[in-house]
Amino acid sequence: MAKDILKNQDPKLQAMIVEHSAPAPKEIPMDAPVLKRVARPLRHVKFIPIKSLIFHTKTGPMDFSYEKKIKTPIPKNKIVVRVSNVGLNPVDMKIRNGYTSSIYGEIGLGREYSGVITEVGENLNYAWHVGDEVYGIYYHPHLAVGCLQSSILVDPKVDPILLRPESVSAEEAAGSLFCLATGYNILNKLSKNKYLKQDSNVLINGGTSSVGMFVIQLLKRHYKLQKKLVIVTSANGPQVLQEKFPDLADEMIFIDYLTCRGKSSKPLRKMLEEKKISQYDPVEDKETILNYNEGKFDVVLDFVGGYDILSHSSSLIHGGGAYVTTVGDYVANYKEDIFDSWDNPSANARKMFGSIIWSYNYTHYYFDPNAKTASANNDWIEQCGDFLKNGTVKCVVDKVYDWKDHKEAFSYMATQRAQGKLIMNVEKF
């Protein structure tokens, strides 16, 4: 049986097991596999991705979001600006304080900026170009959007925007237009209504606020005010203002509100009665007595708030004078104040009947850069741009933060101790 099986051999299988004399082929050498990073292939992206700083409620945290996008191609009458710097303003905190519920979703921050144009709608190619360095105001408080994001879609017919001059840094430009325009519009209205003249006697409450600093420069350099400015400020305020504006150092008289526990009306009335005031110079550590014979004030500009000066208005403000506040009767509190909230009844009464009941004109001024109520010949955007370009005014920057340090920036602003603008750098995305 076994012999029969061995005889029955398959010649094909037998050929496969025969040992051949030819050597086996050499193994082809191969390098060890190495992973290499390669460029991502081009894709036809139909939107511009955005990184933005947002919040949901006033008590919730601020955080970064990547949900927003700008669709391309952009509208014909709009431009895209890649934001490089953003100026912080108290209105940012007031807007945030108004959101007590998260039902509105993501809320943006930031109202003024500087940056570079990256996209131009086809109808605007005659006026704007890719690469233009610009600055402007992005003010849409009721739309829950802000400019603290990597790119913004701007409508030049609605959003104030200007080319940034070489003499103004990106950080200075980002912190200029909102407060400068506030101050200029106040003074422009006072001048047109004959309240502000070259020989007017002016009191400024809050001289180291950003609006206050711009107003000081405008009054002296643009409106050519002849008399010295009386400025209510903190203990180191005089030193800050004299260092920032050395050409105006002798044009200012200072009242330290801390020495009178916030009741600045007391030293003001004393100055008017005695016709002199004591000024302390911390640098030279000496005290000087200045004569003051100007009498009551023609214009009072309040950037702090409070009722103290108003309560003594009969002894401080001239008949036919003007009192303008950007805050109201209550002292500003950035942690609690809400955007667009009502004044108290007495303030509302003054606004309606002030010129009848009292001897001066009372105005609670709100700056709305998108409002169409201004007169047709009020070209405040171009005028403010010229002020910055020709050096009439300069933005005083207190501190600059990277936007990853946004908690520190907003915490510092909440202390209400900033003496100048707070600027946030926005990284490219």
UniProtKB/Swiss-Prot annotation:
Q: Which Pfam families match?
A: ADH_N (PF08240), ADH_zinc_N_2 (PF13602)
For this record, the Gene Ontology CC terms, alphabetical, are: Golgi apparatus; Golgi membrane; late endosome; late endosome membrane; membrane raft; plasma membrane
Q: Where in the cell is it found?
A: Cell membrane; Membrane raft; Golgi apparatus membrane; Late endosome membrane
GO MF term set: oxidoreductase activity
Which BP terms does GO give this entry?
protein targeting to membrane; protein transport into membrane raft
UniProt keyword annotations, A-Z: Cell membrane, Endosome, Golgi apparatus, Membrane
User: Membrane topology per the record?
Assistant: Peripheral membrane protein
- Family annotation (PANTHER family): PROTEIN AST1-RELATED
Q: What does this chain do? A: Lipid raft-associated protein involved in the targeting of PMA1 from Golgi to the plasma membrane. May induce clustering of PMA1, which facilitates partition of PMA1 into lipid rafts after leaving the ER and its transport to the cell surface.
The record's subunit annotation is:
Interacts with PMA1.
Name of the protein: Protein AST1
Q: Which species expresses this protein natively?
A: Saccharomyces cerevisiae (strain ATCC 204508 / S288c) (Baker's yeast)
